[in-house]
Regions:
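Short beta-strand-to-loop junctions in surface cap/lid or active-site-entrance loops
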Residues: 2-11
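Short alpha-helix in the alpha/beta-hydrolase fold that links the catalytic acid
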Residues: 141, 154-164
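Hydrolases whose catalytic domains are alpha/beta-hydrolase-1, hotdog thioesterase
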Residues: 92-96, 104, 131
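Alpha/beta-hydrolase active-site loop
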Residues: 27, 55-78, 91, 95
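Catalytic active-site module of serine/aspartate enzymes centered on a nucleophile-bearing elbow/loop
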Residues: 188-216
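Short beta-strand/loop motif that positions the catalytic acidic residue
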Residues: 139, 145-147
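Conserved alpha/beta-hydrolase "nucleophile elbow" surrounding the catalytic nucleophile
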Residues: 81, 85-90, 148
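Short substrate-entry loop that stabilizes the transition state in hydrolases
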Residues: 11-12, 17-53, 152-155
């Protein structure tokens, strides 16, 4: 397994980062550098790229399974873990925290769990998978959730359902933001709304995330 690892090692505060479908944490590097600068051990596994709409069940499950493997490999057993995830990475983080996604066959999926996860910072998470009965009932990790107003991949309406979880949820809708506005290096050809200042937003996002994962 390959992973981008930053900050102190063997630390009591671990940030486990889950990239979107592209699977490359380097595309979020300034964010991860900011988290490491706030005295967090950052573990960001690299994953095979896939197209989310075409992903197989095995490809999907490889994401939360890989996150658990990375924790077991590089984090201290007693570490307090926050998962920061974008898009399908947010889906994987929710799985670890106890959410149960419902598959394309209409049945609940058996996904990996990680009881050390106490916080989730989710950017445009793929929340549509958690619309089934009781899908969010076991999620008690505190959540900071961002949704892009202009996102057509993970629409605000889908993300709003995360408020059905029993956990505290701070959900913020970002005006003019799209699905890839949360990436420091978005896919080629990405076009932002005219009124959206991505550089400023990303700086604010990194600071807010750092404050969230390090809060007492």
């Amino acid at each position: 397994m390959q992973a981008l690892r930053l900050g102190p090692t063997g630390h009591e505060r671990v940030v486990l980062f889950a990239a979107g479908a592209g699977g490359d944490p380097e595309r979020y590097r300034p964010l991860l550098d900011q988290l490491a600068a706030h005295d967090c051990q950052v573990i960001a596994p690299c994953f095979e790229r896939f197209v989310a709409r075409e992903a197989t069940t095995a490809q999907l499950l490889a994401r939360p399974a890989g996150l658990v493997e990375a924790l077991h490999r590089w984090a201290a057993p007693e570490a307090d873990v926050a998962v920061v995830g974008h898009s399908i990475g947010g889906w994987a983080g929710l799985c670890l925290a106890g959410a149960t996604p419902w598959g394309r066959d209409g049945e609940p999926m058996d996904v990996p769990r990680e009881p050390r996860v106490s916080r989730l910072a989710l950017y445009a998470p793929a929340a549509g998978w958690f619309a089934g009965p009781g899908a969010l009932d076991a999620v008690t990790a505190t959540m900071l959730v961002y949704a892009g107003e202009m996102d057509t991949i993970t629409p605000v309406e889908q993300i709003m359902q995360l408020k059905n979880a029993p956990a505290p949820v701070d959900l913020r809708v970002v005006p003019e933001a799209g699905h890839f506005s949360f990436m420091n290096t978005p896919p080629p050809g990405t076009v932002e709304s005219d009124g959206f200042d991505r550089a400023r937003f990303l700086a604010d996002l990194a600071q807010a995330t750092a404050e969230f994962v390090t809060a007492a």
